[in-house]
């Protein structure tokens, strides 16, 4: 397994596939290589013309973590991956990973060649105080060492019925998700910082082309969030995919990535 070492000493495990211009896939909450069944499909389909990097975000899978957490440290992880592929790369981010990728694009304007965001889960109607309170609740669970409760809280927050959450906790698949439960605090921190009124000013540093994509079968707030992000980032464009939701078909989104980065 190839690895890179981030600036704070964290080891980031990744896979590299294909040849051509590099695209780094930035995962959303709960996603990592051991459980992700969608990202590998896109990686395979794009590897005939791009170098695709998939990696475990810090604290997940084969990547280590060093406390305390800061969004900048995850940006540093992405910078280390970009260096490993020659100093230039495009970024594709899914959900909260799209927001992290946006922060990296703003922080690394000379290194990121383009950014495709799929459904950044920013609710323009949510106040920064609410976002920070949600982060504080996750941080408290993390401090108490309760990754399972963190995962259950997250799943309930995205609409999974309580009975389904309870059933999932009894299933064989639960252990792989509970294993990364503590990292949900990272995603909530990313989203809280993005909800802050200072975020659009940071994003003005973006120089690369940006495409913000959503599916028309997703929750309405996903559309509103995608629209808001697109108007907050210089030169960003928008696209909506018919029939797609937050759990998209990789055979539909993959060609969009190919067209944008090609």
Language-model regions, residue ranges each:
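Conserved HGGG/HGGXW glycine-rich cap/lid loop of the alpha/beta-hydrolase fold
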Residues: 3-64
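Short, surface-exposed alpha-helical segments at coil->helix boundaries
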Residues: 40, 84, 223-227
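Active-site loop/oxyanion-hole signature of alpha/beta-hydrolase fold enzymes
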Residues: 44-45, 53-92
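Active-site loop/turn elements of alpha/beta-hydrolase fold enzymes
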Residues: 57-59, 120, 241-243
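Conserved hydrolase catalytic core segment
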Residues: 88-126
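Helix-rich cap/lid subdomain of alpha/beta-hydrolase
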Residues: 120, 124-175, 186-191
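Conserved serine/cysteine hydrolase catalytic core
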Residues: 176-231, 237-240, 244, 248-250
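Post-His helix in hydrolase/transferase enzymes
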Residues: 245-261
